């Protein structure tokens, strides 16, 4: 590009809308230095991705944030080995749903926190 060029270039920055979800594991899932991750899936175009969850001190639960335009609409919550830190199925100790053949649908009713049942085999969405 020449300094004397009559062509002008502009950049437009668009802020992506995000949504934060929360996860409340039971006491059993918190043992042995486990960490938590979520496997997110877009059922419309069959894309998926791993997200690590971080602990939210103020709410006493774990969280992850998705970009709304990515269209992820279902998840698998995973209890991961403390080490290695890589999110992949080989490092997943337990998951919900436990059937290995399904997902938990992300809520569309304003609820934003998945609370794991005491037996670790399911849970329900609540508002945090």
What is the predicted function of each stretch?
Residues 1-7, 94-117:
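Short, surface-exposed beta-strand/turn "edge" patches of beta-sheet domains
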């Amino acid at each position: 590009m020449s300094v004397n060029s009559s062509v002008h270039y502009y950049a437009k920055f668009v802020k992506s809308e995000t949504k934060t979800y929360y996860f409340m594991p039971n006491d059993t899932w918190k043992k042995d230095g486990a960490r938590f991750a979520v496997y997110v899936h877009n059922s419309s175009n069959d894309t998926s991705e791993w997200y690590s969850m971080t602990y939210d001190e103020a709410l006493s639960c774990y969280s992850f944030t998705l970009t709304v335009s990515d269209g992820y609409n279902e998840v698998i919550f995973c209890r991961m080995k403390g080490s290695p830190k890589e999110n992949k199925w080989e490092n997943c100790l337990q998951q919900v749903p436990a059937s290995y053949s399904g997902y938990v649908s992300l809520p569309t009713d304003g609820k934003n926190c998945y609370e794991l049942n005491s037996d670790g085999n399911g849970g329900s969405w609540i508002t945090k």
